[in-house]
């Protein structure tokens, strides 16, 4: 099923220099006349050249997928006492125009320029001109792929940088190479209309040989919904008269129009019956590690990767394997962790908890000659366990690290179900029966059948008004999408990012205090101050007390402090563990509005010849 990537890899080096500048034009994209594709195979090769960019480590190979979506209230990367202009500056919202990890901006425009070239080449092709504009065909599917990739790149640009240059035609020899920024509302509205135009003439994943490794009709329907909720949501806007000001959070007046679009296109996919949640929650991600890509299940589109070529999934995110030179699975230098308040927000019986929150790591034991589990540091090592190198179809080999070849998930059917429920609730002012059914479908997979009556039907039926249903969706999307670079952007469009981060720090403190003193009560009185573990014969851990605050150590077990470590003492008083003030800095959170957008890199500003500038005090 990696045939598409083998084709992509053959094209990946074309026009991809190691030092790529914003709007730098590489042959053959420097054109003096319009391109035209004379065959489907020619157009297909051109599209593969666009997909090749998506897998680059500056895009979904690592940087865009695994740097830009953090930190938030459920996931974080660790940062230092002093802000750094590295990936850590992205995570703690202190990035300056000199930050070294913003090349994704440039590569998004490389992808856009290649997509624009494909769009022009197909539009000029007799195959396209003579095709039925109302029915799916391969030439029109290829056209839709190009527009979908372009839309995806503009979604990433606008939600990370705000207003950016908007280019809808491939760069040509005589073009203006210094475009200014376009309002993000205009950009998002345009690409939504693009996708609405091409969606009916594309094939569903099940109709394609490459299944979900190519953009397809179902993925485009989901992408329309995601873009529409972003266009209809909140975002930080600049004070054009005062670039040093933080700006303001703003929601467009026409937001309900876009919620209706989100409802319409998510409903369209639901009613098509093309996708289900047949695979278990664990299987969705295990399948990715095993290179299994069903065309009719939860996954709608994932960026194709290849072993020993690209992808940091399983290495920078997933189950942690400490560095060693003996395991055929290599090791994993995991950057991302979950917060303990998130871990303990799951209901009892929710099977997603133990997949999304892993309280252990793997370490090589020289005495036994194998990998064995050890308890994780609860402050900074409880990892997202959706992906594991131990699940890979082909082990990386000794000292294996990056380039796992595990695909990056862009959009799932579960996301479409929850976006539909959200849009319906907003449009009707209360949850509709169809919105409840969509939420129930997601929760049915999350809980065993014997809990469906209580945790699915009773729970959802009890959400009777707009606000309680919305709050439930805020939680559900956290429980469903941990580690998939979705949460931060959800909180932004809901105007909840700053509020949730402030709330998180209070919850961390309360958890530390209340778990140490359960008799004092509070919502965290029953979470464990300590957990207790012993080794099984196979090297895995037998952990007791993970879900209760036990008061004594069971015979044969070792005591290990857990939630109580969220606080430490200073001058005889408990304070929040100091590391959390690095991961979530008060200097950032105390500013209202919180500046979450990244500055445009100083080199891009310099190259723009005055057409671009930074705002928000950056």
List PLM regions with ranges.
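Bacterial Sec-dependent N-terminal signal peptides
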Residues: 3, 15-39, 191, 225, ...
């Amino acid at each position: 099923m990696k045939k598409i990537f083998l084709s992509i890899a053959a094209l990946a080096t074309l026009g991809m220099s190691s030092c790529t500048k914003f709007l730098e034009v590489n042959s053959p994209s420097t054109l003096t006349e319009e391109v035209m594709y004379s065959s489907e195979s020619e157009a297909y090769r051109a599209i593969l050249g666009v997909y090749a960019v998506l897998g680059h480590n500056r895009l979904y190979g690592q940087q865009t997928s695994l740097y830009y979506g953090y930190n938030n209230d459920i996931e974080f990367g660790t940062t230092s006492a002093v802000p750094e202009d590295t990936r850590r500056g992205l995570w703690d919202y202190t990035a300056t125009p000199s930050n070294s990890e913003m090349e994704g901006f440039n590569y998004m425009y490389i992808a856009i320029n290649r997509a624009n070239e494909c769009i022009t080449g197909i539009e000029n092709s007799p195959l396209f001109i003579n095709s039925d504009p109302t029915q799916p065909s391969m030439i029109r599917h290829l056209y839709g792929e190009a527009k979908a990739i372009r839309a995806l790149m503009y979604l990433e640009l606008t939600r990370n940088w705000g207003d950016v240059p908007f280019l809808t035609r491939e760069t040509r020899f005589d073009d203006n190479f210094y475009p200014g920024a376009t309002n993000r509302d205009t950009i998002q509205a345009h690409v939504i209309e693009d996708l609405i135009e091409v969606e009916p003439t594309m094939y569903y994943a099940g109709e394609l040989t490459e299944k979900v490794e190519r953009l397809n009709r179902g993925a485009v329907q989901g992408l329309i919904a995601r873009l529409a909720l972003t266009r209809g949501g909140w975002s930080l806007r600049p004070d054009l008269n005062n670039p040093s000001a933080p700006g303001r959070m703003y929601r467009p007046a026409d937001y309900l129009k876009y919620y209706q679009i989100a409802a319409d296109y998510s409903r369209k996919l639901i009613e098509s019956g093309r996708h289900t949640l047949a695979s278990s929650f664990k299987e969705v991600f295990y399948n990715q590690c095993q290179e299994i890509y069903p065309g009719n299940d939860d996954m709608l589109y994932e960026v194709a990767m290849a072993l020993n070529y690209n992808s940091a999934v399983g290495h920078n995110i997933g189950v942690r394997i400490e560095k060693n030179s003996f395991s055929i699975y290599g090791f994993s230098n995991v950057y991302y962790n979950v917060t303990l308040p998130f871990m303990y927000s799951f209901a009892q019986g929710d099977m997603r908890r133990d997949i999304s929150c892993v309280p252990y790591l793997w370490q090589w034991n020289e005495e036994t000659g194998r990998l064995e589990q050890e308890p994780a540091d609860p402050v900074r090592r409880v990892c997202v366990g959706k992906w594991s190198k131990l699940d890979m179809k082909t082990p990386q080999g000794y000292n294996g690290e990056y380039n796992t070849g595990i695909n990056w998930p862009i959009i799932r059917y579960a996301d479409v179900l929850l976006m539909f429920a959200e849009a319906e609730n907003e449009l009707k002012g209360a949850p509709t029966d169809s919105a409840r059914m969509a939420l129930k479908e997601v929760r049915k997979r999350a809980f065993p059948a014997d809990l469906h009556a209580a945790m699915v039907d009773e729970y959802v039926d009890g959400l009777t008004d707009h606000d309680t249903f919305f709050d439930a969706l805020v939680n559900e999307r956290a429980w469903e999408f941990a580690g998939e670079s979705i949460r931060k952007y959800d909180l932004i469009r809901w105007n909840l990012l700053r509020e949730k981060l402030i709330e998180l720090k209070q919850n961390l403190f309360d958890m530390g205090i209340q778990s140490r003193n359960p008799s004092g009560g509070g919502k965290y009185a029953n979470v464990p101050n300590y957990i207790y573990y012993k080794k099984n014969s196979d090297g895995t851990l037998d952990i007791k007390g993970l879900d209760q605050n036990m008061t004594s150590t069971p015979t044969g077990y070792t005591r290990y402090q857990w939630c109580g470590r969220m606080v430490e003492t200073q001058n005889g008083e408990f304070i929040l563990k100091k590391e959390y003030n690095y991961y979530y800095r008060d200097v950032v959170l105390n500013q209202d509005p919180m500046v979450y957008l990244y500055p445009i890199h100083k080199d891009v500003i310099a190259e723009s010849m005055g057409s671009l500038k930074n705002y928000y005090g950056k």
